[in-house]
Amino acid sequence: MPTQYTSPATIDAPGSRAIFVVGAGRSGTSTITRALQALGVELGDRLKAPTQKNPTGFFEDRDLLGIAKRVRSELGLRAESVALIDPQLWGSPALEVLTNEAEETIRRRFGRYPLWGFKYAQTLRMLPFWESVMARTGIKLAFVVAARNPLSVARSRNKLDPLRGLQEKTDLEWLVNVVPYFRRLAGYPFVVIEYDLLMEDPHAQLMRMAAALDIPLDAVNRRGIEEFAGEFLQPGMRHSRFSEADLDKHPRLNPLARDAYRWLRRLATDQISTDDEALWQDWLQLESRLAEKAPALRHVDYLEAEVRRNRGGAFSRLLTRLFSRR
Protein backbone atom coordinates (compact mmCIF):
# COMPACT_ATOMS: atom_id res chain seq x y z
CA MET A 1 0.00 0.00 0.00
CA PRO A 2 1.26 3.54 -0.73
CA THR A 3 2.46 5.56 2.23
CA GLN A 4 -0.12 7.94 3.71
CA TYR A 5 0.54 11.39 2.25
CA THR A 6 0.00 14.74 3.91
CA SER A 7 0.37 17.82 1.72
CA PRO A 8 2.41 20.73 3.07
CA ALA A 9 0.85 23.95 4.27
CA THR A 10 0.55 26.51 1.51
CA ILE A 11 -0.96 29.91 0.92
CA ASP A 12 -3.97 28.89 -1.15
CA ALA A 13 -5.82 31.58 -3.07
CA PRO A 14 -9.53 31.36 -2.23
CA GLY A 15 -11.48 30.14 -5.23
CA SER A 16 -8.31 29.25 -7.14
CA ARG A 17 -8.93 28.06 -10.70
CA ALA A 18 -6.74 26.24 -13.20
CA ILE A 19 -7.02 26.07 -16.97
CA PHE A 20 -5.35 23.16 -18.75
CA VAL A 21 -4.59 23.45 -22.46
CA VAL A 22 -5.00 20.05 -24.12
CA GLY A 23 -4.93 18.60 -27.62
CA ALA A 24 -2.68 16.60 -29.91
CA GLY A 25 0.82 17.86 -30.66
CA ARG A 26 1.26 20.30 -33.57
CA SER A 27 -2.28 21.60 -33.01
CA GLY A 28 -1.31 25.02 -31.70
CA THR A 29 -1.26 24.24 -27.98
CA SER A 30 1.74 26.53 -27.37
CA THR A 31 0.18 29.47 -29.20
CA ILE A 32 -3.10 28.98 -27.36
CA THR A 33 -1.30 28.86 -24.02
CA ARG A 34 0.41 32.14 -24.88
CA ALA A 35 -3.08 33.49 -25.62
CA LEU A 36 -4.18 32.49 -22.13
CA GLN A 37 -1.20 34.37 -20.73
CA ALA A 38 -2.40 37.43 -22.65
CA LEU A 39 -5.71 37.08 -20.81
CA GLY A 40 -3.93 37.24 -17.47
CA VAL A 41 -3.59 33.52 -16.73
CA GLU A 42 -0.46 32.82 -14.65
CA LEU A 43 1.87 30.22 -16.20
CA GLY A 44 4.59 30.27 -13.55
CA ASP A 45 8.21 31.37 -13.63
CA ARG A 46 9.85 28.10 -14.68
CA LEU A 47 8.86 27.78 -18.32
CA LYS A 48 10.63 25.45 -20.73
CA ALA A 49 13.00 27.41 -22.97
CA PRO A 50 12.26 27.83 -26.69
CA THR A 51 14.06 25.49 -29.09
CA GLN A 52 14.39 25.13 -32.85
CA LYS A 53 11.33 22.87 -32.69
CA ASN A 54 9.30 25.71 -31.21
CA PRO A 55 11.23 29.00 -31.41
CA THR A 56 8.38 31.16 -30.07
CA GLY A 57 8.20 29.13 -26.86
CA PHE A 58 6.45 26.08 -25.39
CA PHE A 59 4.89 27.85 -22.37
CA GLU A 60 5.16 24.65 -20.34
CA ASP A 61 6.00 24.62 -16.63
CA ARG A 62 9.16 22.56 -16.26
CA ASP A 63 8.21 21.00 -12.92
CA LEU A 64 4.79 19.78 -14.02
CA LEU A 65 6.16 18.83 -17.43
CA GLY A 66 8.75 16.61 -15.77
CA ILE A 67 6.05 14.87 -13.73
CA ALA A 68 3.88 14.40 -16.83
CA LYS A 69 6.72 12.73 -18.70
CA ARG A 70 7.38 10.39 -15.79
CA VAL A 71 3.69 9.46 -15.77
CA ARG A 72 3.95 8.69 -19.46
CA SER A 73 6.98 6.50 -18.81
CA GLU A 74 5.21 4.62 -15.99
CA LEU A 75 2.39 3.90 -18.43
CA GLY A 76 4.92 2.31 -20.78
CA LEU A 77 4.53 5.00 -23.44
CA ARG A 78 6.90 7.06 -25.56
CA ALA A 79 6.13 10.41 -27.16
CA GLU A 80 5.18 8.65 -30.40
CA SER A 81 3.28 5.71 -28.85
CA VAL A 82 -0.23 4.96 -30.06
CA ALA A 83 -1.14 2.01 -27.82
CA LEU A 84 -4.29 2.58 -25.77
CA ILE A 85 -3.81 2.80 -22.00
CA ASP A 86 -4.99 -0.10 -19.84
CA PRO A 87 -7.45 1.49 -17.33
CA GLN A 88 -6.02 -0.67 -14.52
CA LEU A 89 -2.72 1.22 -14.75
CA TRP A 90 -4.28 4.37 -13.32
CA GLY A 91 -4.36 2.76 -9.86
CA SER A 92 -0.72 1.67 -9.77
CA PRO A 93 1.45 2.49 -6.72
CA ALA A 94 3.97 4.27 -8.96
CA LEU A 95 1.29 6.68 -10.20
CA GLU A 96 0.12 7.22 -6.62
CA VAL A 97 3.60 8.49 -5.77
CA LEU A 98 3.52 10.83 -8.77
CA THR A 99 0.02 12.00 -7.84
CA ASN A 100 1.33 13.03 -4.44
CA GLU A 101 4.28 14.81 -6.02
CA ALA A 102 2.08 16.64 -8.52
CA GLU A 103 -0.28 17.77 -5.77
CA GLU A 104 2.60 19.09 -3.66
CA THR A 105 4.11 20.86 -6.68
CA ILE A 106 0.83 22.54 -7.61
CA ARG A 107 0.19 23.72 -4.05
CA ARG A 108 3.73 25.04 -3.71
CA ARG A 109 4.07 26.61 -7.15
CA PHE A 110 0.54 27.76 -7.99
CA GLY A 111 -1.56 27.66 -4.83
CA ARG A 112 -1.32 31.42 -4.30
CA TYR A 113 -2.64 32.33 -7.75
CA PRO A 114 -6.38 32.85 -8.30
CA LEU A 115 -6.08 31.81 -11.97
CA TRP A 116 -3.26 29.78 -13.46
CA GLY A 117 -2.68 27.49 -16.41
CA PHE A 118 -0.70 24.47 -17.55
CA LYS A 119 -0.05 23.01 -20.96
CA TYR A 120 1.30 19.66 -22.09
CA ALA A 121 0.10 18.18 -25.36
CA GLN A 122 -0.52 14.72 -23.87
CA THR A 123 -2.49 15.89 -20.83
CA LEU A 124 -5.82 14.78 -22.30
CA ARG A 125 -4.39 11.32 -22.93
CA MET A 126 -3.45 11.12 -19.23
CA LEU A 127 -6.55 12.90 -17.95
CA PRO A 128 -7.45 10.35 -15.21
CA PHE A 129 -4.12 11.10 -13.52
CA TRP A 130 -4.61 14.86 -13.61
CA GLU A 131 -8.22 14.61 -12.48
CA SER A 132 -7.03 12.72 -9.41
CA VAL A 133 -4.37 15.33 -8.71
CA MET A 134 -6.72 18.28 -9.07
CA ALA A 135 -9.44 16.66 -6.98
CA ARG A 136 -6.98 16.51 -4.08
CA THR A 137 -6.04 20.17 -4.41
CA GLY A 138 -9.65 21.35 -4.49
CA ILE A 139 -8.77 23.74 -7.32
CA LYS A 140 -11.52 24.19 -9.89
CA LEU A 141 -10.50 22.98 -13.32
CA ALA A 142 -11.36 24.12 -16.84
CA PHE A 143 -9.95 23.27 -20.26
CA VAL A 144 -9.02 24.77 -23.60
CA VAL A 145 -8.96 22.16 -26.36
CA ALA A 146 -6.65 22.93 -29.28
CA ALA A 147 -8.05 21.74 -32.61
CA ARG A 148 -6.42 21.74 -36.02
CA ASN A 149 -7.17 20.10 -39.33
CA PRO A 150 -5.46 16.65 -39.23
CA LEU A 151 -3.95 17.30 -42.66
CA SER A 152 -2.17 20.37 -41.30
CA VAL A 153 -1.09 18.47 -38.19
CA ALA A 154 0.61 15.84 -40.35
CA ARG A 155 2.27 18.46 -42.54
CA SER A 156 3.66 20.21 -39.45
CA ARG A 157 4.81 16.96 -37.84
CA ASN A 158 6.53 15.83 -41.03
CA LYS A 159 8.89 18.80 -40.91
CA LEU A 160 10.18 17.55 -37.54
CA ASP A 161 10.00 13.78 -37.94
CA PRO A 162 9.18 12.23 -41.34
CA LEU A 163 8.23 8.88 -39.80
CA ARG A 164 5.77 10.36 -37.31
CA GLY A 165 4.70 12.85 -39.97
CA LEU A 166 3.22 10.20 -42.25
CA GLN A 167 -0.49 11.00 -42.48
CA GLU A 168 -1.45 7.51 -41.29
CA LYS A 169 0.84 7.72 -38.24
CA THR A 170 -0.03 11.29 -37.34
CA ASP A 171 -3.73 10.42 -37.44
CA LEU A 172 -3.20 7.57 -34.99
CA GLU A 173 -1.28 9.82 -32.59
CA TRP A 174 -4.03 12.44 -32.92
CA LEU A 175 -6.73 9.89 -32.17
CA VAL A 176 -5.18 8.33 -29.07
CA ASN A 177 -4.42 11.77 -27.64
CA VAL A 178 -7.90 13.19 -28.18
CA VAL A 179 -10.61 10.53 -28.38
CA PRO A 180 -10.37 8.22 -25.31
CA TYR A 181 -11.01 10.77 -22.53
CA PHE A 182 -12.55 13.74 -24.33
CA ARG A 183 -16.04 12.88 -23.04
CA ARG A 184 -14.82 13.52 -19.49
CA LEU A 185 -14.55 17.21 -20.34
CA ALA A 186 -18.35 17.36 -20.35
CA GLY A 187 -18.09 17.66 -16.57
CA TYR A 188 -15.97 20.82 -16.72
CA PRO A 189 -16.08 24.25 -18.35
CA PHE A 190 -14.21 23.97 -21.64
CA VAL A 191 -13.82 25.70 -24.97
CA VAL A 192 -12.41 24.48 -28.29
CA ILE A 193 -10.07 26.84 -30.16
CA GLU A 194 -9.28 26.09 -33.80
CA TYR A 195 -5.73 27.08 -34.71
CA ASP A 196 -6.59 28.43 -38.15
CA LEU A 197 -9.38 30.59 -36.72
CA LEU A 198 -7.03 31.89 -34.03
CA MET A 199 -4.49 32.91 -36.66
CA GLU A 200 -7.17 34.59 -38.79
CA ASP A 201 -8.97 36.53 -36.06
CA PRO A 202 -7.11 36.41 -32.74
CA HIS A 203 -9.24 39.11 -31.14
CA ALA A 204 -12.46 37.16 -31.69
CA GLN A 205 -10.96 33.89 -30.48
CA LEU A 206 -9.50 35.38 -27.30
CA MET A 207 -12.85 36.99 -26.55
CA ARG A 208 -14.52 33.59 -27.05
CA MET A 209 -11.99 32.02 -24.71
CA ALA A 210 -12.48 34.66 -22.04
CA ALA A 211 -16.27 34.38 -22.19
CA ALA A 212 -16.34 30.59 -22.09
CA LEU A 213 -13.88 30.40 -19.18
CA ASP A 214 -15.35 33.33 -17.25
CA ILE A 215 -12.16 35.39 -17.40
CA PRO A 216 -13.00 39.04 -16.69
CA LEU A 217 -11.53 41.54 -19.14
CA ASP A 218 -9.90 44.71 -17.88
CA ALA A 219 -7.53 47.27 -19.36
CA VAL A 220 -4.49 45.07 -18.68
CA ASN A 221 -6.03 42.04 -20.39
CA ARG A 222 -7.14 44.09 -23.36
CA ARG A 223 -3.59 45.36 -23.81
CA GLY A 224 -2.44 41.76 -23.58
CA ILE A 225 -4.81 40.80 -26.38
CA GLU A 226 -3.46 43.60 -28.57
CA GLU A 227 0.14 42.56 -27.91
CA PHE A 228 -0.67 38.92 -28.64
CA ALA A 229 -2.43 39.75 -31.91
CA GLY A 230 -0.04 42.45 -33.09
CA GLU A 231 3.35 41.29 -31.83
CA PHE A 232 3.37 37.61 -30.91
CA LEU A 233 1.42 36.14 -33.82
CA GLN A 234 3.35 36.05 -37.09
CA PRO A 235 2.29 34.74 -40.53
CA GLY A 236 5.20 32.29 -40.51
CA MET A 237 3.66 30.43 -37.57
CA ARG A 238 1.26 28.72 -39.97
CA HIS A 239 2.82 26.86 -42.91
CA SER A 240 -0.24 25.07 -44.26
CA ARG A 241 -3.96 25.55 -44.49
CA PHE A 242 -6.52 22.92 -45.45
CA SER A 243 -10.27 23.35 -45.71
CA GLU A 244 -12.91 21.10 -44.25
CA ALA A 245 -13.72 19.97 -47.80
CA ASP A 246 -10.17 18.63 -48.12
CA LEU A 247 -10.98 16.07 -45.44
CA ASP A 248 -13.12 14.11 -47.89
CA LYS A 249 -10.57 14.23 -50.70
CA HIS A 250 -7.41 12.95 -49.03
CA PRO A 251 -7.01 9.20 -49.64
CA ARG A 252 -4.71 8.62 -46.65
CA LEU A 253 -6.69 10.44 -43.98
CA ASN A 254 -8.11 8.18 -41.27
CA PRO A 255 -11.94 8.45 -41.37
CA LEU A 256 -12.05 8.27 -37.58
CA ALA A 257 -9.75 11.31 -37.28
CA ARG A 258 -11.86 13.12 -39.87
CA ASP A 259 -15.10 12.47 -37.97
CA ALA A 260 -13.65 13.42 -34.57
CA TYR A 261 -12.10 16.62 -35.91
CA ARG A 262 -15.40 17.67 -37.48
CA TRP A 263 -17.06 17.56 -34.08
CA LEU A 264 -14.28 19.73 -32.64
CA ARG A 265 -14.65 22.11 -35.56
CA ARG A 266 -18.39 22.46 -34.85
CA LEU A 267 -17.58 23.31 -31.24
CA ALA A 268 -14.86 25.77 -32.29
CA THR A 269 -17.25 27.60 -34.62
CA ASP A 270 -20.12 27.59 -32.10
CA GLN A 271 -22.33 25.53 -34.40
CA ILE A 272 -23.06 23.37 -31.36
CA SER A 273 -22.72 23.87 -27.62
CA THR A 274 -20.71 21.77 -25.18
CA ASP A 275 -23.91 20.12 -23.93
CA ASP A 276 -25.01 18.96 -27.39
CA GLU A 277 -26.53 15.51 -26.92
CA ALA A 278 -25.66 14.29 -30.42
CA LEU A 279 -22.00 15.19 -29.86
CA TRP A 280 -21.63 13.02 -26.79
CA GLN A 281 -23.63 10.14 -28.21
CA ASP A 282 -21.53 10.07 -31.36
CA TRP A 283 -18.30 10.49 -29.42
CA LEU A 284 -19.08 7.31 -27.52
CA GLN A 285 -19.18 5.56 -30.89
CA LEU A 286 -15.83 7.12 -31.81
CA GLU A 287 -14.35 5.68 -28.62
CA SER A 288 -15.69 2.24 -29.46
CA ARG A 289 -14.35 2.38 -33.00
CA LEU A 290 -10.91 3.35 -31.70
CA ALA A 291 -10.97 0.67 -28.97
CA GLU A 292 -11.50 -1.97 -31.66
CA LYS A 293 -8.11 -1.02 -33.07
CA ALA A 294 -6.26 -1.70 -29.78
CA PRO A 295 -4.33 -4.80 -30.96
CA ALA A 296 -3.25 -3.07 -34.17
CA LEU A 297 -2.17 0.03 -32.24
CA ARG A 298 0.04 -2.05 -29.96
CA HIS A 299 1.62 -3.63 -33.02
CA VAL A 300 2.27 -0.21 -34.58
CA ASP A 301 4.23 0.73 -31.45
CA TYR A 302 6.27 -2.46 -31.71
CA LEU A 303 7.07 -1.89 -35.38
CA GLU A 304 8.00 1.75 -34.89
CA ALA A 305 10.29 0.85 -32.00
CA GLU A 306 12.02 -1.68 -34.25
CA VAL A 307 12.44 0.87 -37.03
CA ARG A 308 13.93 3.45 -34.67
CA ARG A 309 16.27 0.87 -33.15
CA ASN A 310 17.51 -0.12 -36.59
CA ARG A 311 17.79 3.25 -38.30
CA GLY A 312 19.67 2.62 -41.52
CA GLY A 313 18.92 -1.11 -41.40
CA ALA A 314 17.22 -3.06 -44.18
CA PHE A 315 13.72 -2.83 -42.65
CA SER A 316 14.05 0.90 -42.07
CA ARG A 317 15.31 1.47 -45.63
CA LEU A 318 12.42 -0.58 -47.02
CA LEU A 319 9.85 1.52 -45.18
CA THR A 320 11.55 4.72 -46.29
CA ARG A 321 11.38 3.63 -49.93
CA LEU A 322 7.76 2.55 -49.65
CA PHE A 323 6.51 5.75 -48.09
CA SER A 324 8.68 8.09 -50.15
CA ARG A 325 6.64 7.01 -53.17
CA ARG A 326 3.35 8.12 -51.62
Model-derived segments and spans:
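PAPS-dependent sulfotransferases, especially Golgi type II membrane carbohydrate sulfotransferases
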Residues: M1-P14, A211, I215-R326
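PAPS-dependent sulfotransferase catalytic core
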Residues: M1-T99, R309, R317
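Proline- and acidic/polar-enriched loop/turn elements at helix boundaries
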Residues: K48-A49, A146, N221-G224
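Short secondary-structure boundary/hinge segments and terminal tails
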Residues: K53-T56, S152, H203, E227-G230
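Residues that form generic nucleotide/phosphate-binding pockets
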Residues: I67-R70, E74, E101, T105-R109, ...
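A polyampholytic, Gly/Pro-enriched intrinsically disordered region
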Residues: I67-R72, L163-L172, H239-D248
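PAPS-dependent sulfotransferase catalytic domain
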Residues: E103-V220
